[in-house]
């Protein structure tokens, strides 16, 4: 077992035993999302702490730091799926995502978005795209995490300017938060919302709804310019 996972489970072993595990897990995901989002959602954290008492902050923060270490150790692993399985609130994902397969899916997605038939030409033209995963129930966002790693590996110099990753919608409880938390820790532009994305005219999810948790990179100067350009383009159409 991973050292980071041992540490996270040690903190979890002190969680209130009289509370349902699934409720504790949902609140941990909400607390972690509010910790990693920009700006930090302190009001939500205060409400969660008030539900259990002050000790819960120490336990959640300890587990959160452990998963952060896990992402730093190997960003390709789905840290929250590992933790959910060991905590007993999820089953091992039946879906296995080979890096090659995800790479092919990403290239095809870029070719579709850029309307280029040549993969190399399409990748060179790929800027300002969004990747949306509506249903995270089956794999806790493993496919999105794998695709984010493909983006980081293919575009090492400017991977934060290639794609926004969006999870949420389709009534998938709190599992939509899992890929967001990991990708935000990885430094990727991303957001998560139970309401799903706001789609522009070209089906790009550049804008986040009010209910969204957003990573710091979502508000970078690059993506702010992209959104302004999209607003200008939409206004011209009116």
Predicted features by range, described:
Residues 233-238:
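Extended alpha-helical scaffolding regions
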């Amino acid at each position: 077992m991973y050292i980071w996972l041992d540490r996270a489970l040690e903190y979890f072993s002190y969680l209130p035993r009289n509370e349902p595990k699934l409720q504790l897990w949902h609140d941990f995901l909400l607390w972690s999302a509010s910790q990693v989002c920009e700006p930090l959602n302190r009001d939500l954290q205060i409400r969660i702490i008030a539900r259990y008492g002050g000790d819960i902050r120490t336990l959640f923060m300890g587990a959160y730091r452990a998963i952060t270490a896990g992402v730093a150790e190997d960003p390709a692993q789905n840290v929250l799926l590992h933790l959910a399985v060991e905590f007993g609130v999820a089953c091992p994902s039946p879906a296995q995502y080979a890096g090659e397969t995800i790479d092919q899916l990403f290239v095809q997605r870029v070719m579709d978005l850029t309307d280029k038939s040549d993969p190399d030409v399409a990748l060179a033209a790929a800027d300002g795209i969004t990747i949306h995963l509506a249903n995270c129930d089956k794999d806790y966002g493993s496919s999105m995490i794998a695709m984010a790693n493909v983006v980081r590996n293919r575009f090492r110099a400017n991977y934060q300017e290639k794609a926004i990753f969006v999870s949420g919608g389709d009534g998938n409880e709190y599992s939509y938060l899992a890929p967001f938390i990991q990708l935000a820790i990885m430094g990727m532009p991303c957001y998560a919302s139970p309401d799903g994305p706001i789609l522009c005219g070209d089906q790009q999810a550049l804008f986040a709804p009010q209910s969204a948790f957003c990573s710091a990179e979502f508000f970078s100067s690059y993506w702010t310019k992209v959104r302004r350009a999209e607003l200008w383009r939409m206004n011209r159409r009116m």
